[in-house]
Curated annotation (Swiss-Prot):
PANTHER family reported for this sequence: PROPERDIN
Glycosylation sites (chain numbering): 79, 82, 135, 138, 141, 147, 192, 195, 198, 204, 256, 259, 268, 317, 320, 377, 380, 383, 423
Lineage: Eukaryota, Metazoa, Chordata, Craniata, Vertebrata
Disulphides: C28-C52, C39-C68, C53-C71, C85-C123, C89-C129, C100-C107, C128-C166, C144-C180, C148-C186, C159-C170, C201-C244, C205-C250, C220-C234, C265-C302, C269-C308, C280-C292, C323-C365, C332-C371, C345-C355, C386-C450, C390-C456, C402-C434
Keywords recorded for this protein, A-Z: Complement alternate pathway, Disulfide bond, Glycoprotein, Immunity, Innate immunity, Repeat, Secreted, Signal
Functional note: A positive regulator of the alternate pathway of complement. It binds to and stabilizes the C3- and C5-convertase enzyme complexes. Inhibits CFI-CFH mediated degradation of Inhibits CFI-CFH mediated degradation of Complement C3 beta chain (C3b).
Organism this protein belongs to: Mus musculus
Residues covered by the TSP type-1 domain: 24-72, 73-130, 132-187, 189-251, 253-309, 311-372, 374-457
Record-linked InterPro entries: CFP_TSR-0 (IPR049536), CFP_TSR_C (IPR054019), Compl_asym_regulator (IPR052065), TSP1_rpt (IPR000884), TSP1_rpt_sf (IPR036383)
GO biological process, one term: complement activation
Assembly information from the UniProt record: In plasma, properdin exists as dimers, trimers or tetramers in the relative proportions of 26:54:20. Interacts with the pro-C3-convertase enzyme complex (C3b-Bb) comprised of Complement C3 beta chain (C3b) and the Complement factor B Bb fragment (Bb), where it binds (via its TSP type-1 5 domain) with C3b and Bb. This interaction stabilizes the complex and allows it to become the active C3-convertase enzyme complex (C3b-Bb-FP). Interacts with C3b. Interacts with CFB.
Localization of this protein: Secreted
Signal peptide: 1-22
UniProt name for this protein: Properdin
Residue ranges, annotated region (Interaction with Complement C3 beta chain): 346-354
Length: 464
């Protein structure tokens, strides 16, 4: 199908090219997390970018809290989740983005590392907007909340005059309260005063005939229960006992032993770490004494000064060659031919593994390029993304296309005896003929404005 007959599927905008990283010291990390774009596993500070990126799997930051940058060749990150809809009801728009991440090159379409790319689409969280309701008249006052002294009573109203719609509500309170007086005196119930101080321990060590303990008491006087009308006495014990603490044997704090020799470097290329260990046994803690303060291990950075291998990766397949057959014209004839495409293995360095798989791909085909065929109008396509994505005047389109009715050629062919049936595909752009629709013969297009377009903001920018 010609490019001018297709509805746009992705609408892109490139923004914010980050400053190039020089040779100033950076923070070096052992992992670049693709899903979040964050650096993981801090290896060391004040490292040169060239040393950190001896391993293409590492990543770096120019300063604490800065943008994490991968050492590998530039690639597009995964698309972020769609942002919130610009309105909470009716139709609006939402954005998502991705970033060109890496160093030493460019992403597809000659895009520099650090560049943001945006997409905008229409959205609708809720098909209707809330409508406020109205209150009914207040109901009668309810009974007093207490049977003696003063309390409160309430009355209520209902949000149904009219009832709210589509998630709306009535402004104000559904309930009112006011003071009420029963004209009756309430009894005073007893309450405990605060506990007194603990008495001295009844013993000086553990293991005697009786368990050493401390005792404290309290009185029912805060307040005391009334006599007329009678109040309830305090519930619970007036005395409390507990076992004495801090008696011998005394605790012994732990102490560190000497550091072990350095372990070998953890890697054979690039930057790694060595490890030292020590044990809390000079002396070991006893009788509840505290464990040794500090770390039982410590790391030091080591540099093998050897680049790490980088395995090759297949580049995208090239275009299919023309569908042809040796010494025979097969255009519009229904005779099968062959076509091929190839790809290259790039990025392999420092004795990395070559790409696995085929360098060339061959398939069987029918050549229908520029063949005149009967056509039919397709259904409306889905709405495209909004373009431009960061403009308040963004629009979206959908299309109906004159699509060819492909001939019913055999779907498989046996070109070489003993090799079985092979699938055959159609190749080329035919010339479909349809009855005119809205004055058009090939494409009918409908355009619509995108509503409530949000502002494009770099998600890495710090909020004030």
């Amino acid at each position: 199908m010609p490019a001018e007959m297709q509805a746009p599927q992705w609408l892109l905008l490139l923004l914010v090219i980050l400053p190039a990283t020089g040779s100033d010291p950076v923070l070096c990390f052992t992992q670049y997390e693709e899903s979040s774009g964050r650096c993981k596993g801090l290896l060391g500070r004040d490292i040169r970018v060239e040393d950190c990126c001896l391993n293409a799997a590492y990543a770096f930051q120019e300063h604490d809290g800065g943008l994490c940058q991968a050492c590998r060749s530039p690639q597009w990150s995964a698309w972020s989740l769609w942002g919130p809809c610009s309105v909470t009801c009716s139709e609006g728009s939402q954005l998502r983005h991705r970033r060109c991440v890496g160093r030493g090159g460019q992403c597809s379409e000659n895009v520099a590392p650090g560049t943001l790319e945006w997409q905008l689409q229409a959205c609708e969280d809720q098909p209707c907007c809330p409508e406020m309701g109205g209150w009914s008249e207040w109901g009668p006052w309810g009974p007093c909340s207490v049977t003696c002294s003063k309390g409160t009573q309430i009355r209520q109203r209902v949000c149904d005059n009219p009832a709210p719609k589509c998630g709306g509500h009535c402004p104000g309170e559904a309930q009112q309260s006011q003071a009420c007086d029963t004209q009756k005196t309430c009894p005073t119930h007893g309450a405990w005063a605060s506990w007194g101080p603990w008495s001295p321990c009844s013993g000086s060590c553990l293991g005697g005939a009786q368990e050493p303990k401390e005792t404290r008491s309290r009185s029912c006087s805060a307040p005391a229960p009334s006599h007329q009308p009678p109040g309830k006495p305090c519930s619970g014990p007036a005395y409390e006992h507990k076992a004495c603490s801090g008696l011998p044997p005394c605790p012994v704090a732990g102490g560190w032993g000497p550091w072990s020799p350095l372990s070998p470097c953890s890697v054979t290329c690039g930057l790694g770490q060595t490890l030292e260990q020590r044990t809390c046994d000079h002396p070991a803690p006893r009788h509840g004494g505290p464990f040794c303060a500090g770390d039982a291990t410590r790391n030091q950075m080591c540099n093998k000064a050897v680049p790490c291998p980088v395995n090759g990766e297949w580049e995208a397949w090239g275009k299919w060659s023309d569908c042809s057959r040796l010494r025979m014209s097969i255009n519009c004839e229904g005779t099968p031919g062959q076509q091929s495409r190839s790809r290259s293995c790039g990025g392999r360095k420092f004795n990395g593994k070559p790409c696995a798989g085929k360098l060339q791909d061959i398939r069987h085909c029918y050549n229908i390029h520029n063949c005149i065929m009967k056509g039919s109008w397709s259904q409306w396509s889905t709405w495209s993304l909004c373009t431009p994505p960061c403009s308040p005047n963004a629009t979206r389109v959908r299309q109906r296309l004159c699509t060819p009715l492909l001939p019913k050629y055999p779907p498989t062919v046996s070109m070489v005896e003993g090799q079985g049936e092979k699938n055959v595909t159609f190749w080329g752009t035919p010339r479909p003929l349809c009855e005119a629709l809205q004055g058009q013969k090939l494409v009918v297009e409908e355009k619509r404005s995108c509503l409530h377009v949000p502002v494009c903001k770099d998600p890495e920018e710090k909020k004030p």
